[in-house]
Amino acid sequence: MIQMQTNLDVADNSGARRVMCIKVLGGSKRKYASVGDIIVVSIKEAIPRGRVKKGDVMKAVVVRTAKDIRRPDGSVIRFDKNAAVLVDNKKEPIGTRIFGPVPRELRAKNHMKIISLAPEVL
């Protein structure tokens, strides 16, 4: 459950390390984002010589949340930290690698490129 001002880790090699959510996309009154949703983020911490720099405003897809994700079979999955992958306006990842596991729910939201780059799909 991601809302405005939430800090997230970046799960790709775009050069950003930490980002902060500044808007949840998808309706004027929408407050929360979950796995697979697109948010607008501000880069708060970045490595030198990365593709992005501190202060940039970009879009990102939420790939891991500390809030549980309920599945239709009754099982629950949750992660230790909130994480996102930076994407461009065509919803393609900016980085070439994804770090850590991603949930199956990304497939239903049509983020196939992220799923194909991820080392593990839970």
From Swiss-Prot:
InterPro entries: Ribosomal_uL14, Ribosomal_uL14_bac-type, Ribosomal_uL14_CS, Ribosomal_uL14_sf. Keywords: Ribonucleoprotein, Ribosomal protein, RNA-binding, rRNA-binding. Coiled coil: none annotated. SUPFAM superfamilies: Ribosomal protein L14. GO terms for molecular function: large ribosomal subunit rRNA binding; structural constituent of ribosome. GO terms for biological process: translation. SMART domains: Ribosomal_L14. GO terms for cellular component: cytosolic large ribosomal subunit. It comes from the Bacteria. Belongs to the universal ribosomal protein uL14 family. Part of the 50S ribosomal subunit. Forms a cluster with proteins L3 and L19. In the 70S ribosome, L14 and L19 interact and together make contacts with the 16S rRNA in bridges B5 and B8. Binds to 23S rRNA. Forms part of two intersubunit bridges in the 70S ribosome. This is Large ribosomal subunit protein uL14. It comes from Mesorhizobium japonicum (strain LMG 29417 / CECT 9101 / MAFF 303099) (Mesorhizobium loti (strain MAFF 303099)). The gene is rplN.
